[in-house]
C-alpha cells in the first residue's frame, strides 16, 4: 500500500510538471534523443561540417543521458558526461562536442519550445590543451613514401595518399581540400590552385611550388583529368594514411602535421602577411602560435 502511495505521488508530480510546462507553451514528454534526431535532420545538413557533426551526434546518442526527457536533463548530467568523456578523448574534442550540444539546447529553448532553461548555463568548458607542435621531417616523409608504391605508380590509394602528403607539405592545404581539388581550379600557367570554400568560410588562391606542379602533372598523366585531381575520398585518404604510418612505424604523425611543416618552410620564403594569405588565417596569432614551428638551431645559424 505504501509503495502504491509512492507511485501515485510520483505520477502526480510528473503530471503537475507536464501541466506546468504546457502552461508555459513548452512540450513535455519529449526525449532528448528525439530532439537530437530532429536537430540532425533540420540543422546539421545546413552546416559545412555536416559529416563530422553527424558522426559526433550519433555517437552521443548512444549515451544514457539522451534517454531522458530533455526537460529533465540537468547541469549535473552534462558535467558527469564531460568527466566521463575526458577519460577517453582530449579536451579539444570535448570542447567541440559541447559546442554542438550547447547549440542543440539553444535551438530547443529559443526555437522549438522544449525547455525553459538550458542546462548548459554555468557549465565550465575543459581547459584548452597545448597546441600540437609536431612537424613532419624529410625522414618521416621518405619512410612513408618508400612503402607506398608512389615511385612506381599512382594507380593505388596508397600511392595517391603519398602524393597527397607530398603535395600538402608543398602547399599547406588541408586533407579535405586536397581531396576535393578539381582540375578546373588548377591553373598550370599561373601555378595556382583556387579553393572555392574553405574552413573560414571564404575562398582563396594557393600558390603552387614547382614540386607541387610536378605532382599534379604526373597525376594528370597517370590518372587522367576527368575527375578530381587526386581521385581519392577523404575517408579513404584518412584510413590509408593510418595504415601507411603504422607500417612505417610513424604512428605519432597526424596528416595535419604536414600543414604545420609546410607553413614553417614557407615562412623562410615569404613574410607573415603573405603566409597568412596562403594559409587562410585571419588571426595572425593562431598562425604564429599553432602552425609556425621553427627549429631554433636553424634560427641561431641565421643570427650569425
UniProtKB/Swiss-Prot annotation:
| Keyword DNA-binding carried by entry | yes
The record, for Gene3D superfamilies, names: 1.10.150.130, Intergrase catalytic core (1.10.443.10)
Q: Which UniProt keywords apply?
A: DNA integration, DNA recombination, DNA-binding, Viral genome integration, Virus entry into host cell
Q: GO molecular-function annotation terms?
A: DNA binding; site-specific recombinase activity
Q: Where is the Core-binding (CB) domain?
A: 30-109
Active site, per annotation: 174, 199, 256, 259, 281, 291
Per the record, the domain of life is Bacteria
**A UniProt-annotated Pfam family:** Phage_integrase
Annotated Tyr recombinase domain ranges read: 131-304
Q: Which GO terms describe its biological process?
A: chromosome segregation; DNA recombination; establishment of integrated proviral latency; symbiont entry into host cell; viral genome integration into host DNA
Family statement drawn from the similarity comment of this UniProt entry: Belongs to the 'phage' integrase family.
Q: What is this protein called?
A: Putative integrase/recombinase HI_1414
- Native organism: Haemophilus influenzae (strain ATCC 51907 / DSM 11121 / KW20 / Rd)
Amino acid at each position: 500500500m505504501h509503495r502504491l502511495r509512492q507511485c501515485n505521488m510520483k505520477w502526480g508530480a510528473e503530471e503537475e510538471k507536464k501541466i506546468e510546462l504546457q502552461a508555459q507553451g513548452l512540450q513535455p514528454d519529449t526525449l532528448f534523443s528525439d530532439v537530437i534526431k530532429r536537430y540532425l535532420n533540420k540543422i546539421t545538413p545546413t552546416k559545412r561540417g555536416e559529416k563530422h557533426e553527424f558522426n559526433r551526434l550519433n555517437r552521443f546518442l548512444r549515451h544514457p543521458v539522451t534517454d531522458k526527457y530533455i526537460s529533465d536533463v540537468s547541469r549535473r548530467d552534462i558535467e558527469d558526461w564531460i568527466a566521463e568523456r575526458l577519460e577517453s578523448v582530449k579536451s579539444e574534442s570535448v570542447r567541440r562536442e559541447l559546442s554542438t550540444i550547447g547549440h542543440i539546447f539553444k535551438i530547443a529553448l529559443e526555437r522549438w519550445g522544449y525547455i525553459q532553461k538550458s542546462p548548459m548555463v554555468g557549465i565550465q568548458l575543459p581547459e584548452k590543451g597545448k597546441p600540437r607542435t609536431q612537424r613532419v621531417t624529410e625522414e618521416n616523409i621518405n619512410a612513408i613514401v618508400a612503402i607506398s608504391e608512389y615511385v612506381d605508380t599512382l594507380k593505388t590509394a596508397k600511392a595517391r595518399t603519398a602524393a597527397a602528403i607530398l603535395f600538402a607539405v608543398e602547399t599547406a592545404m588541408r586533407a579535405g581540400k586536397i581531396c576535393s581539388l578539381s582540375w578546373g581550379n588548377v591553373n598550370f600557367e599561373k601555378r595556382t590552385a583556387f579553393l572555392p570554400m574553405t574552413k573560414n568560410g571564404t575562398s582563396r588562391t594557393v600558390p603552387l611550388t614547382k614540386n607541387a606542379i610536378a605532382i599534379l602533372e604526373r597525376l594528370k598523366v597517370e590518372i587522367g583529368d576527368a575527375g578530381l585531381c587526386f581521385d581519392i575520398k577523404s575517408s579513404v585518404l584518412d584510413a590509408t594514411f593510418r595504415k601507411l604510418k603504422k607500417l612505417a612505424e610513424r604512428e605519432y604523425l597526424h596528416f595535419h602535421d604536414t600543414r604545420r611543416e609546410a607553413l614553417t618552410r614557407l615562412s623562410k620564403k615569404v613574410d607573415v602577411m603573405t603566409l597568412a594569405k596562403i594559409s587562410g588565417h585571419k588571426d595572425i596569432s593562431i598562425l604564429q602560435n599553432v602552425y609556425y614551428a621553427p627549429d631554433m638551431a636553424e634560427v641561431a645559424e641565421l643570427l650569425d
